[in-house]
């Protein structure tokens, strides 16, 4: 098994990015990318701008791509620029720079249309579906569609250019790392199904960097009592 150590991390200033830097920083040599100056060393790149992306991944063995508009309510314009164009530019830079593996932050929302919901962040707790990766996607938002685009672009680059691709359909991770913060709110049942702890997020990305695969999709949620994905 090839071990990758020089890792690019886009969207490093987001919740997941900070969790990974804290949890994996001693194991990997990270090059962090952000859109603006932050309180840790980073390279500023807008990934929807080709001129800024070119050369960004030189010397890297793998990239964890988190940068995107993360909101299920995101507008088409934002999704188009940050999630679609950004994904294309990241894949092209992986190809140009010889990056071996891309770990892509996809989302649980790619299959939310298989549940009864009123908004992308509510679930009907009376409907129990163990959704599986081999089922057709059923996105609930433009955001979810953009993540399916990323998964399929990853498949194309895996087949055509040999890029190893791991797409993680991530649940709901919060900075507080405490699902009880949603108790009594409309999002409580959603959180009980989708919560992803910091510990499990770190372990999932470690395994995504290490697993022997050419192309892989995986659910990434904690062992929640009300989970709707077949783990």
Language model features: what each stretch is:
Residues 4-26:
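N-terminal Rossmann NAD(P)H-binding glycine-rich loop of SDR-like oxidoreductase domains
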Residues 35-50:
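Rossmann-fold cofactor-recognition segment
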Residues 46-82, 93:
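NAD(P)H-binding glycine-rich loop region in Rossmannoid oxidoreductase-like domains
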Residues 89-140:
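Conserved Rossmann-fold NAD(P)-dependent oxidoreductase catalytic core, especially the SDR/UDP-sugar
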Residues 142-149:
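Active-site helix of classical SDR
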Residues 145, 166-170, 185-207:
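Substrate-positioning beta->alpha
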Residues 151-176:
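Conserved beta-loop-beta element that borders a ligand/cofactor-binding pocket
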Residues 182-183, 217-218, 223-231:
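Conserved C-terminal active-site "lid" loop/helix of NAD(P)H-dependent oxidoreductases
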């Amino acid at each position: 098994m090839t071990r990758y150590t020089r890792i690019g991390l886009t969207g490093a200033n987001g919740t997941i990015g900070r969790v990974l830097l804290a949890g994996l920083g001693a194991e990997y040599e990270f090059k962090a990318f952000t859109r603006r100056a932050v309180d840790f060393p980073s390279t500023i790149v807008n990934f929807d701008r080709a001129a800024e992306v070119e050369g960004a991944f030189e010397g890297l063995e793998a990239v964890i791509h988190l940068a995107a508009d993360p909101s299920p309510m995101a507008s088409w314009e934002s999704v188009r620029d940050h999630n679609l164009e950004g994904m294309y530019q990241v894949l092209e830079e992986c190809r140009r720079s010889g990056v071996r593996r891309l770990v892509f932050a996809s989302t649980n929302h790619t299959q939310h249309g298989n549940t009864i919901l009123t908004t992308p962040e509510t679930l009907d707790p009376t409907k129990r579906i163990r959704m599986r990766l081999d089922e057709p996607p059923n996105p609930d938002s433009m955001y979810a569609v953009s993540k399916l685009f990323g998964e399929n672009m990853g498949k194309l680059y895996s087949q055509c250019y040999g890029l190893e691709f791991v797409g993680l359909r991530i649940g709901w991770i919060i900075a507080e790392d405490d699902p009880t913060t949603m108790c009594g709110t409309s999002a409580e049942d959603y959180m009980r199904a989708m919560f992803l702890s910091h510990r499990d997020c770190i372990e999932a990305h470690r395994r995504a960097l290490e697993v022997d695969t050419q192309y892989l999709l995986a659910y990434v949620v904690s062992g929640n009592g009300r989970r709707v994905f077949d783990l």
